[in-house]
Amino acid sequence: MLLFYMVRKENQNMKIKRLLAAVLSLAMGVSMMTACGSSDSSSKAENDSSATENTQKHTNDPMTVTTAKDLVAQMKVGWNLGNTMDATGSGLDAETSWGNVETTKLMIDQVKDAGFNVFRLPVSWGTHMDENYTVDEAWMNRVQEIVDYGIDNGMFVILNTHHEEWYMPKKDRADKDVEQLKALWKQICDRFQGYDEHLIFEGVNEPRLRGEGNEWIGDAESREVVNQYAKAFVETVRASGGNNPNRCIMVTPYAASSTKQNMEALEVPQGDDKIIVSIHAYLPYSFALDTAGTDQYTSIDSSITTLFTDINEVFLSKGIPVIIGEFGSVNKANTEARVQCVKDYLSTAKQYGVPCCWWDNGTRIGNGENFGLLNRSEGGWYFPEIVDAIMETVNS
């Protein structure tokens, strides 16, 4: 607990140092303006040193995994840093704008030490891009810093685009959406091209008709546009430099839906053995996701078995590996039931060779979706029984 306090204190001191450096830099810039021209932006001044360190850290790491199936076989279980870099505010303060504390390496080390070997990093980019789709340098640097927390301790890191409100899967918006999607992923690819197979790109997160009556079901048109997103994403990554032509990447059906209709509608690129399908499934729904639903779980639910038989039929049987990018159950003061559910869920997933990533949004109490496991402020786990059940199941 003390160590977490010290890390937070160190982060505060670093922020003060960066602020002082920025003030001094600005003062020097004003005094030398006639000789040197206008000064750099404060965000760039604050991040120059970290940018240099980060971008030079993984410039040409050798790739060793040959196919997506080989890669997925090495994954045990994953953890999401939810409601953090995916918050939709602007500037670096967005990281903590939804109530979570600033991410530290110590947090991610603790996740790894608990037994998770996959770290999914949800990131929202839209509010950090200008009118030319250029990503703010300071935001890119911070994303890379957190990516390195996982990469440097041997975890697989899934980097995505998350709460993006600039795309809507409709035909009349598809061209503009694809243009921005390509521009964004080109920049991400350029920054991370030297990383090895431990870094996985995930094109979009739950692409859907936000706010509409069929938001989570979709229709033929929206499913087709989602396929256009996937195609543009894959083409952009494969056309970029470094290790990206051989990188394992993830595509998703409409809304990352586990319904058979939406999974069957996904057009997985042919002839590319480094493609993984991402599915989200909080099951059984009334227990796992519906905050007004039941808090009871006594035996394996048919929705769990149906999920994996459908995944097997649509993807696995055709040689296409799958990752459950998000799963979990909300806290309803029912830890014993949650333990049993996670055991059933993961034991079934293990039978099919599908690794799963728990959605941890940092919240454990209240009226909302309380998926939090890690106590990010003080260290330790809110529900160690659930973490133990996860590890017992995936390691059995």
What is each PLM-predicted segment?
Residues E179-G293, L307-V330, Q351-Y352:
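Active-site region of glycoside hydrolase catalytic domains
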Residues M1-N13:
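Short, Lys/Arg-enriched N-terminal segments with co-localized hydrophobic residues
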Residues A51-V118:
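N-terminal carbohydrate-binding accessory modules
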